[in-house]
Amino acid sequence: MGRSLKKGPYVDPKLLKKIRELNEKGEKRIIKTWSRRSVIVPEMVGHTIAVYNGRKHIPVYITENMIGHRLGEFAPTRTFTGHRIPTARITAIK
């Protein structure tokens, strides 16, 4: 079940405070965050936010198309290396 509409989107208060400070100053710099659950709001557009994926911070440039999604959606936690390629020996056995 999703979040109630009357509550509004969740944004980490510390992250929102940093975004608002940068907007007031007119600065653009990378903001590190561990809050993958925060929803992207229009105030964040144009900023680069480094989202932690469990190992390192992945820089994510926020665009208008991302509004309403969560930060964690753009920093994958698992790396898919691909399936095993069948070798000649395995195909000969079949």
From Swiss-Prot:
<dbReference type="GO" id="GO:0015935">
    <property type="term" value="C:small ribosomal subunit"/>
</dbReference>
<dbReference type="InterPro" id="IPR020934">
    <property type="entry name" value="Ribosomal_uS19_CS"/>
</dbReference>
<comment type="function">
    <text>Protein S19 forms a complex with S13 that binds strongly to the 16S ribosomal RNA.</text>
</comment>
<keyword id="KW-0699">rRNA-binding</keyword>
<dbReference type="InterPro" id="IPR005732">
    <property type="entry name" value="Ribosomal_uS19_bac-type"/>
</dbReference>
<dbReference type="GO" id="GO:0000028">
    <property type="term" value="P:ribosomal small subunit assembly"/>
</dbReference>
<dbReference type="InterPro" id="IPR023575">
    <property type="entry name" value="Ribosomal_uS19_SF"/>
</dbReference>
<dbReference type="Pfam" id="PF00203">
    <property type="entry name" value="Ribosomal_S19"/>
</dbReference>
<dbReference type="InterPro" id="IPR002222">
    <property type="entry name" value="Ribosomal_uS19"/>
</dbReference>
<keyword id="KW-0689">Ribosomal protein</keyword>
<dbReference type="GO" id="GO:0005737">
    <property type="term" value="C:cytoplasm"/>
</dbReference>
<protein>
    <recommendedName>
        <fullName>Small ribosomal subunit protein uS19</fullName>
    </recommendedName>
</protein>
<dbReference type="GO" id="GO:0006412">
    <property type="term" value="P:translation"/>
</dbReference>
<keyword id="KW-0687">Ribonucleoprotein</keyword>
<keyword id="KW-0694">RNA-binding</keyword>
<dbReference type="GO" id="GO:0019843">
    <property type="term" value="F:rRNA binding"/>
</dbReference>
<dbReference type="GO" id="GO:0003735">
    <property type="term" value="F:structural constituent of ribosome"/>
</dbReference>
<comment type="similarity">
    <text>Belongs to the universal ribosomal protein uS19 family.</text>
</comment>
